[in-house]
Amino acid sequence: RASEVALKGENFAKQTYKLLANDLKESGINTDFAPVVDLAINKENKVIVTRGRSFGQSSNEVIKYSSIFVEELKKRNIISVLKHFPGHGSSLGDSHLGFVDITNTWNEKELEPYKYFIKNNKVDMIMTAHVYNKNLDATNPATLSYNINTKLLRNKLGFEGVLVSDDLQMYAISKHYDLKQTLTLSINSGVNMLLFANQLAKPISLKQIVDTVYSQILNEEISLEQIIKSNQRIN
């Protein structure tokens, strides 16, 4: 667990993530959906903090240990994925289970790890969070938000890499949006890669997803330009 790694110090972290990266490399895995760069702001947070998924409460601690993780992955040509943008460590709820509003708990310092990695060109991919913050977007949660994914992450923070959604079948999304809405909003928001884990809800086939996206492009509800941009970023 990240919290335990941070308690044992930098040398332990380096050895731990060196071994992990070696295992991934030997297994033929080229991408790790890690590290979590959420700040442990809310001690009662059941999805990040109490599970020990955060390196700490301060952005400096999170940046220090996540940098070690990313560096060990990079040495072995393994892609890292920072998550969960714009921050899930202050939430009270679990987005696996339902709608999560962080309007009154989110702090702008939760962006600090992302600012650091983007500024220093150390980030390959970023994963979105299914959290709602009316101060950032009064209508949609982050994964479906153009204001957050394009205006904030790309235009303001300068991120040029691949943006991947968290599992779109988590109940924060699937209980409030149908497949067509989810695909349309997420793609148009600036998400480049869509994640469907097929664990929490009725399985959705790749054909269903492709057919729905294609239909929405023909209906001019999904931007073809965005599809082309996503393909270029992923390639």
Where does each model-flagged region fall?
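Second-shell residues forming the walls of enzyme active-site clefts
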Residues: 63-216, 221-225
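Glycine-rich anion/phosphate-binding loops
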Residues: 7-21, 60-64, 106-108
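Active-site-proximal loop/short-helix segments
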Residues: 1, 30-52, 79-99
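Active-site loop-helix segments enriched in His/Asp/Glu that coordinate
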Residues: 45-56, 202-209
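Glycine-rich, aromatic-flanked loop segments that form ligand/cofactor-binding clefts
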Residues: 16-40, 62-86
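A charged helix-plus-loop insertion that forms the helical arch/lid used to bind
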Residues: 1-8, 52-56
